[in-house]
Amino acid sequence: MKLEAVTFDVTHTLLSCPTLGQQYADVLARHGIEVAARDIEAAIPLVWQELACSASPARDRFLHHANGARGFWRHFVERTCELVDAARPSAFAAAELFDRFAQAAAWEVAPGTRGMLADLRRRGLRLAVISNWDQRLPLLLERLELADHFDTFAISAIVGAEKPHPRIFETALAALGVAAEHALHVGYSRRDDVEGARGVGMQALLLSPAGDGDLRSLAELPARLFGDRQQTG
């Protein structure tokens, strides 16, 4: 089957944030809340999953919140602090964190990503992002100088549905003008990325640096798809 398009998850796939807990701890400390970065780091995925349970994937968590994305993230920060027995953060602390993670300096682009994306574009593939993110994502990708690699962005807060719901994948496919069987999705979550993509008829590859997936890094993708060793730097 001819491959015409590749779509990508964002967090833990295109981007990483190895200092996530420390960034939270630094901001909270400026607002009078002392908490260990390692405790925040451990709590964040638990809170993300907990808050996901309050909304069906057919209803994006950011749109689902009465006060939108900022309201969701304020709730997120408050719940994270509660989980680590820290004081309740102010609205100013939550706002500073919200603004910080819209900046390029808060993130790292995964090694090999830029070269890999350029390689796929040279081969004539259409590219898209499919991500459970809020409306800040397009600007963030611009600031990271990644946006120009992509033909379209399917973002849950704009589409109104989260992965693994079919609607977010179908939105990307429609924008790309590509049938599901001619598209591949790459992401780190078996449920959201692999099962979600396959559920609409796309191919899917699981990214796992630990080695229990299909790819250890995005730099391996061109060789996996085309059987060559072209440098993706």
Where are these regions (language model features)?
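Asp-based, Mg2+/Mn2+-dependent phosphohydrolase catalytic module
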Residues: 1-6, 38, 87-93, 108, ...
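N-terminal helical cap/lid subdomain that shapes the substrate entry/recognition surface
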Residues: 1-114, 122-123
